[in-house]
A protein has these predicted regions:
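Glycine- and other small-residue-rich loops at beta-strand/loop junctions that grip anionic moieties
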Residues: 1, 22, 46, 50, ...
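Glycine-rich phosphate/adenylate-binding loop and adjacent beta-alpha elements
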Residues: 1-9
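Glycine/charged-rich beta-loop-alpha catalytic/anionic-binding loops adjacent to active sites
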Residues: 8-18, 79, 158-159
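A general structural signal for well-ordered alpha-helical segments in protein cores
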Residues: 9, 27-30, 54, 110, ...
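Structural detector of well-ordered beta-strand residues that form the stable sheet scaffold
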Residues: 10, 46, 70, 91, ...
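Mid-domain Rossmann-like dinucleotide-binding core that forms the NAD(H)/NADP(H) cofactor-binding site
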Residues: 17-95
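Glycine-rich cofactor phosphate-binding loops and adjacent beta1-alpha1 units
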Residues: 37, 80-81, 85-159
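C-terminal substrate-binding/catalytic core of Rossmann-like NAD(P)-dependent dehydrogenases/reductases
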Residues: 102-103, 144-186
Length: 186
């Protein structure tokens, strides 16, 4: 057991199962990340990595009205799960990812790219998926020594933004639990 201040406790009603309530923490991270990156209606979104958290990002993007939602995932089972979670398109060939993203976004690139894996090569690739004025959500954790090469002038001239997000806070926890209790996520 751990003693914590009462203000940090979120009471659960009987209507929410423990198996659902335990998802509050990871969903709170996704809730916070969506707010930090400013995800909004009708924006195109690319989610790199359709593991559990990547699929949470897909569901949040759908809930917020993003369109199209594009997942990039090599694993066939995870690719299918991404479709079930709300991805409009799933790209399974990394060699054709940029070409397909451009085709799905009328040649512009994505408004928002979410890297949810934490692999340096995928971060490099994510930078190429953004449209001018686009935003990259750095969500996938790397080790402390990981570095990626960027071209600052390209980011400046294209007015792009890179935003990090790591953990949900109090309000995010409450919002995540509210959404879970109203069955907004599968």
């Amino acid at each position: 057991y751990v003693a914590i201040p009462a203000r940090l406790v979120i009471p659960l009603g009987d209507e929410i199962a423990d198996s659902v309530a335990c998802l509050t923490e990871p969903f709170s991270c996704v809730v916070r990340a969506s707010k930090k990156i400013g995800l909004s209606v009708a924006e195109s979104v690319v989610v790199i990595g359709a593991g559990p958290v990547g699929n949470m990002h897909i569901q949040m993007a759908r809930l917020l009205g993003a369109a199209p939602i594009i997942a990039v995932e090599l694993n066939p089972q995870r690719a299918e799960l991404a479709r079930q979670c709300g991805a409009d398109s799933v790209i399974t060939d990394p060699e054709r990812a940029l070409e397909q993203i451009k085709a799905l976004t009328e040649g512009r690139g994505a408004d928002v790219v979410i890297e949810s894996v934490g692999h340096p090569e995928l971060y490099q690739q994510a930078l190429t998926f953004m449209r001018p004025g686009g935003r990259l959500l750095a969500f996938g954790l790397t080790d402390a020594e990981t570095e990626i090469a960027i071209k600052p002038l390209e980011i400046i001239l294209k007015e792009q933004r890179i935003q990090g997000s790591v953990a949900g806070m109090g309000e995010d926890m409450h919002q995540a639990l509210h959404l879970l209790s109203h069955q907004r996520f599968i």
